[in-house]
Amino acid sequence: MSHNSFGHLFRVTTWGESHGLALGCVVDGCPPGITFTEAEIQSFLDKRKPGQSKYTTQRREPDQVRVLSGVLLGEDGVTMTTTGTPISMMIENTDQRSKDYGEIARQYRPGHADYAYDVKYGIRDYRGGGRSSARETAARVAAGAIARKVVPGLEVRGALVSIGAHDIDRSRWNWAEVDNNPFFTPDAGSVEVFADYLDGIRKNGSSVGAIIEIVAEGVPAGIGAPIYGKLDQDIASYLMSINAVKGVEIGNGFEAARLTGEENADEMRMGNDGKPIFLSNHAGGVLGGIATGAPVVARFAVKPTSSILTPRRSINKDGNEVDVMTRGRHDPCVGIRAVPIGEAMVACAIADHYLRHRGQTGRV
């Protein structure tokens, strides 16, 4: 199985499966001299890890990261400095229950990658989905923590903006609320609505999708490239690579098709500091594939988890028709834990373009 790496200069390879002994990543191309601690990486992994509320899978993994290479440990025994060599990080799996998946070893879950993997490879790891499991994304979050350090002043934040047909009230958007509730939503007024809705979904053994918005501030104007190397192109590609993501939009996205040219254009003026400012940000911080200096805004849609208790019609590996009902521990809304994953992927895309821009132009 190939295609386990992404990026050009800031290149990330992830490895491991849902029910293997461990998973991890190798970050190649990280510049030397960047300092960080394992605790900083852990803080992002803790946002993604399972078992933190009744609205996510009850699989309990500490997701404790270990940095194995590519750094020098400082005299304080905590601070690490990158050497420019590959940074390898590992996260052990400690709460696998492979016996829960015995019934689906030869069955294809509708909406899951089971059938597609079998068609391509002739074999699949049915235990928790193997490589197609969202468990793999823990490694991406670790890589994203390093990526945030590459671009000076970069801040990447994400929030859940809808679950099913329930949207937040954007007039109540408050970033400070995101870490104060189990849904990573910026609208405190939506917490009870989401909770009541997901309680019903969870009790019925069903699942539901979500939409997540990522905002990156401090993105240097000029990074990116035209035509086939666009910044927004790569952000979309990185986000689409996340398990269960079925759609991505940048800035106004599909809504731009409903606007006139006058409504959609981001007008400009000179700021008091003598630098250009945009009076709106319909473009989501990218024009012609190149960052404008405005916040980069992306949204992605996550489909409902395929593993549900409701019997669904399918077939098995022998070609027999079966009804599939998935047991085990699963997220009623996998979109909740996709928030830190989306942040990580956007950070990796920006870090890669930052290094490419610096290498091509000598400017940042």
UniProtKB/Swiss-Prot annotation:
Keywords: Amino-acid biosynthesis, Aromatic amino acid biosynthesis, FAD, Flavoprotein, FMN, Lyase, NADP
GO cellular component term of the entry, any: cytosol
Similarity comment: family membership: Belongs to the chorismate synthase family.
Role noted for this protein: This reaction introduces a second double bond into the aromatic ring system.
HAMAP family in the cross-refs: Chorismate_synth
Pathway: Metabolic intermediate biosynthesis; chorismate biosynthesis; chorismate from D-erythrose 4-phosphate and phosphoenolpyruvate: step 7/7
Signal sequence range: none
Gene Ontology MF, one: FMN binding
SUBUNIT field: Homotetramer.
PROSITE patterns linked: CHORISMATE_SYNTHASE_1 (PS00787), CHORISMATE_SYNTHASE_2 (PS00788), CHORISMATE_SYNTHASE_3 (PS00789)
Cofactor: FMNH2
Protein name in UniProt: Chorismate synthase
GO BP annotation list: amino acid biosynthetic process; aromatic amino acid family biosynthetic process; chorismate biosynthetic process
Matches recorded under Pfam families: Chorismate_synt
Binding site for NADP(+): R48
Keyword NADP belongs to the record: yes
Catalytic activity, reaction form: 5-O-(1-carboxyvinyl)-3-phosphoshikimate = chorismate + phosphate
EC assignment: 4.2.3.5
Lineage, uppermost ranks: Bacteria, Pseudomonadati, Pseudomonadota, Alphaproteobacteria, Hyphomicrobiales
Binding-site list for FMN: R131, S132, S133, N243, A244, G288, K303, P304, T305, S306, S307, R329
Co-factor remark: Reduced FMN (FMNH(2)).
Claim: Transmembrane is one of the keywords in the record: no
